[in-house]
Amino acid sequence: MDILGATLRVYVDDLEKAIPFYEGLAGGRAMRSERGGVEVAAVGCFLLMSGPESQLEVLRKVAATIAVTDVEETLRAITSLGGDVIAGPVPTPAGRNLIARHPDGAIYEYVDRRA
């Protein structure tokens, strides 16, 4: 399993107001999507999220989003090391993801770019 990088989750009240700041900071354009009533904008290493508190409450439990080469390989590594998969793997607009709980209780999202 190769870890390619991590994305910092930022929860904002107003996505439209937040995007210009993070675009300027990261030096890139936001890639937007929507899932389950939550608006998302990926800008560099930041993942901005805005939506209903009931949805954000669940998302806030995830410490970070970690990019990997292959979600299936990651699933095998996590479970063999004593972690468990809470959700997924499922398709996303960019590839696939899963949510896993590590043996210490920390929860992470793992994503790949495979279709």
Per-range role (PLM):
Residues 64-87:
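Mid-chain, well-packed structural core segment of small domains
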Residues 1-19, 62-64, 114-115:
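N-terminal beta-strand motif that seeds the catalytic metal site of vicinal oxygen chelate
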Residues 1, 79-115:
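Vicinal oxygen chelate
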Residues 18-23, 78, 105:
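Conserved active-site tyrosine of GNAT-family acetyltransferases
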Residues 28-61, 107-113:
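Conserved short beta-strand elements that form part of the metal-binding/catalytic scaffold
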Residues 14, 70, 102:
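Acidic di-acidic motifs
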Residues 24-31, 82-84:
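Conserved acetyl-CoA-binding loop of GNAT-fold acetyltransferases
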